[in-house]
């Protein structure tokens, strides 16, 4: 029987029970022990010890005193069964229940009390031992499972490369790349299935992994004359679409480029560091080589690397930006100051819904610094667009000229593009990555510092242009035109303001087109150390231009003044008579101004001569600035046609314009913002020199144009002496 069923009993008046529990070896001490039990009963009850103390000293057998064993009153099986049955119903009996139970079982109420206490303690201990045992078994099982999984992880191999895949040995970038690689591999499998189906229908075999470059002719760029009279920096033979053997390579290259762009656009240090003079983030080439061990291949000898990243908020939704990037006419128009020409050669993949998700197309482009002194960069690449999630898009470019024979481009685009994330109120967060290799040694002149530091085509140049152009679009689409009114300004209706903004937009578009799309002879003449590019265009049946031969002359020069200072001076109407030959020394007045950007200097203005002048000419001026470039563009317009357009509801597209103006760049020596360093100016004039559809260019017309541009350059230089630097 367990100990819980044996309750220590003090002297309860039952001398027979006490005598039976005494030691039989001490016959003479029975009476004494019983009396001792009576004397110390209360003490023994508290301690649970029923021994009688030290009354055995006078024993007749002279033996040493012995401690007596504890006395227990063992309950009968019937008593235990009754109490256990009662315990199951009520483990905590009150005093009345204990008295009733004691009377029923012939026990003392105190015995009942202690039995229930012991029973509760016993049950509690048994439950705790059971729970501890279960937890111990579960813990051992989890330890064993954990050890098994650890061993499995350390022994696992990458199915792609066969290398170890221990998570503890991988960087975050590597882990992210492996996840992306698995997803892109699945896409390739799906596309391969589609390609096989097409192959069965057309009879043209498709190889998944061709190992040799196809004998494909080089692309046909169909660009006009390049800068400095050259014909570009590559062969211009005709080509057809990419053949069936090349397309799988191009697709796999585009998928890998997208994977790399996603990492490049999101990972910070140590992959990216502070850029030159605090401009866009610059790429850590050593870290790049560690992170991306494959891709476009090793860097080309003699090529210079330009890599940067910039992030900004843009006033356009992601789908609008994607559409602008995927259509070459919109792309070249949006980035007219950077992209001279663009062409889509072939669309390899297209989204059936028409939203550009998954579109893959082969393109070529000519990138330019607006100057006749800088050679253009030409690139042949594939552009891939993919939606990465809800409100998140990515567009990536990567050169594919190395897949084609007989082509020698000097600009190679590694994975470059942008990550576009939807924000609130129609805005987008754009992270732009620009990563190119270029061989442009010996083509710098005064632009050497700007180009060699990577600022000419840096990511902040692209982002700054995008932000500025989106501001312009928003202002045209808005009905709340922000005009600057004063006492001498004319009053314009909303139609008049809209017409004026459209004319200013045409001036900018035509100015850039005149710098890049002119065809015909290109002549260079040395004028005080500057080269002047003179080109001709013939205008026929263009309602926005006069018919005849139009000459476009351009040159670049340096000024020892910050870009902001030069921009603010040239845009002011009150300063124009100091440098504009067409003003004939007369003061110009601003009679209307409409802002088309956050910066109030981004605006369209209408200028005219003083009230005493008999001139019928007015000037529409477009001024635009961002941290990387500024423009002061203008065109003389007929006063009568402008009055009809602004007040009579005329079509602004029929106002005849020939734009001229200035492109202002930092010289690369100052900090961003245009408040330090010098300025690089490109001045361009467009003039009608011979009217009529059959007119031809004459030598005197060229001489007149050169003299005009030379005089303007000299006047501006005189206004900014060297001591202002």
Curated annotation (Swiss-Prot):
Chain residue ranges for the region called Disordered: 1-74
PROSITE patterns in the cross-refs: HOMEOBOX_1 (PS00027), HOMEOBOX_2 (PS50071), START (PS50848)
Subcellular location: Nucleus
Tissues and organs where the protein is expressed, per its UniProt entry: Expressed in siliques.
Regions annotated as coiled coil: 117-201
Record note on quaternary structure: Interacts with AIL7/PLT7, ANT, BBM and AIL1.
Chain ranges of the START domain: 243-475
Taxonomic superkingdom: Eukaryota
SMART domains tied to this protein: HOX, START
Compositionally biased region (Polar residues): 46-64
Record bears the keyword Transcription: yes
Gene label: HDG3
Molecular-function GO terms, alphabetical: DNA binding; DNA-binding transcription factor activity; DNA-binding transcription factor activity, RNA polymerase II-specific; lipid binding
Protein name: Homeobox-leucine zipper protein HDG3
DNA-binding region residue numbers: 68-127
Organism: Arabidopsis thaliana (Mouse-ear cress)
Cellular-component GO terms for this entry: nucleus
Lineage: Eukaryota, Viridiplantae, Streptophyta, Embryophyta, Tracheophyta
Function, in words: Probable transcription factor. Seems to promote cell differentiation.
Any one biological process term the GO annotation gives: cell differentiation
Effect of gene knockout: In plants missing HDG3, HDG7, HDG11, PDF2 and ATML1, increased cell division leading to cell overproliferation.
UniProt keyword annotations, A-Z: Coiled coil, DNA-binding, Homeobox, Nucleus, Transcription, Transcription regulation
This protein's record includes keyword Zinc-finger: no
């Amino acid at each position: 029987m367990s100990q819980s069923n044996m309750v220590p009993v003090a002297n309860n008046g039952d001398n027979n029970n006490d005598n039976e529990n005494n030691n039989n070896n001490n016959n003479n001490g029975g009476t004494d022990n019983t009396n001792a039990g009576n004397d110390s009963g209360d003490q023994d009850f508290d301690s649970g010890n029923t021994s009688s103390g030290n009354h055995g000293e006078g024993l007749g057998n002279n033996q040493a005193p012995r401690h007596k064993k504890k006395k227990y009153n063992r309950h009968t099986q019937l008593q235990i069964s009754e109490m256990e049955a009662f315990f199951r119903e009520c483990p905590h009996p009150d005093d009345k229940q204990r008295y009733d139970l004691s009377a029923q079982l012939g026990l003392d109420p105190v015995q009942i009390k202690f039995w229930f206490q012991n029973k509760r303690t016993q049950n509690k201990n048994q439950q705790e031992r059971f729970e501890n045992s279960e937890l111990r078994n579960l813990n051992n099982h989890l330890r064993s499972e954990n050890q098994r999984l650890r061993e499995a992880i350390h022994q696992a191999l990458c199915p792609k490369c066969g290398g170890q895949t221990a998570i503890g040995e991988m960087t975050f970038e590597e882990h992210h790349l492996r996840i992306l690689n698995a997803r892109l591999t699945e896409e390739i499998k799906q596309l391969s299935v589609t390609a096989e189906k097409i192959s069965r229908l057309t009879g043209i075999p498709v190889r998944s992994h061709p190992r040799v470059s196809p004998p494909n002719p080089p692309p046909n760029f169909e660009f006009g004359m390049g800068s400095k009279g050259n014909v570009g920096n590559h062969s211009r033979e005709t080509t057809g679409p990419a053949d069936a053997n090349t397309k799988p390579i191009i697709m796999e290259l585009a998928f890998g480029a997208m994977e790399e762009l996603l990492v490049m656009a999101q990972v910070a240090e140590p992959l990216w560091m502070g850029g030159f003079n605090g401009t866009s983030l610059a790429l850590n080439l050593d870290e790049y080589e560690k992170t991306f061990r494959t891709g476009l291949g090793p860097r080309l000898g003699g090529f210079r690397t330009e890599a940067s990243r910039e992030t900004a908020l843009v006033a356009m939704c992601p789908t609008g930006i994607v559409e602008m990037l995927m259509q070459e006419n919109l792309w070249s128009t949006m980035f007219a100051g950077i992209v001279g020409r663009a062409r889509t050669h072939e669309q390899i993949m297209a989204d059936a819904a028409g939203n550009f998700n998954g579109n893959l197309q082969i393109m070529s482009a000519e990138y330019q610094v607006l100057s006749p002194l800088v050679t253009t960069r030409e690139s042949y690449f594939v552009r891939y667009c993919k939606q990465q999630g809800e409100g998140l898009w990515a567009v990536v470019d990567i050169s594919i000229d190395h897949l084609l024979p007989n082509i020698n481009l000097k600009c190679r685009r590694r994975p470059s593009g942008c990550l576009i994330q939807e924000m609130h109120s129609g805005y987008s967060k754009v992270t732009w990555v620009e990563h190119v290799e270029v061989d442009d040694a010996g083509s710098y002149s005064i632009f050497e510092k700007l180009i060699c530091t990577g600022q000419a085509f840096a990511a902040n140049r692209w982002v700054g242009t995008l932000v500025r152009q989106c501001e312009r679009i928003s202002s045209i689409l808005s009905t709340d035109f922000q005009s600057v009114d004063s006492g001498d300004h004319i009053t314009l209706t909303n139609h008049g303001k809209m017409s004026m903004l459209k004319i200013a937009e045409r001036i900018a578009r035509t100015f850039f087109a005149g710098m890049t799309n002119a065809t015909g002879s290109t002549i260079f003449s040395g004028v005080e150390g500057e080269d002047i590019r003179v080109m001709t265009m013939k205008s026929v049946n263009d309602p926005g231009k006069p018919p005849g031969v139009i000459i476009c002359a351009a040159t670049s020069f340096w000024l020892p003044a910050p870009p902001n200072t030069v921009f603010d001076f040239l845009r002011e109407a009150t300063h124009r008579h100091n440098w504009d030959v067409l003003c004939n020394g007369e003061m110009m007045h601003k009679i209307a101004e409409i802002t088309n950007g956050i910066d109030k200097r981004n605006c369209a203005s209408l200028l005219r001569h003083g009230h005493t002048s008999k001139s019928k000419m007015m000037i529409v001026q477009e001024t635009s600035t961002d941290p990387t470039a500024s423009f002061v563009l203008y065109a003389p317009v007929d006063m009568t046609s402008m009055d009809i357009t602004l007040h009579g509801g005329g079509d602004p597209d029929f106002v005849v314009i020939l734009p001229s103006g200035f492109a202002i760049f930092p010289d690369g020596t100052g900090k961003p913002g245009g408040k330090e360093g010098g300025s690089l100016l490109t001045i361009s004039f467009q003039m009608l020199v011979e009217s009529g559809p059959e007119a031809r260019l004459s030598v005197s017309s060229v001489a007149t144009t050169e003299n005009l541009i030379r005089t303007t350059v000299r006047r501006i230089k005189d206004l900014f002496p060297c001591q202002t630097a």
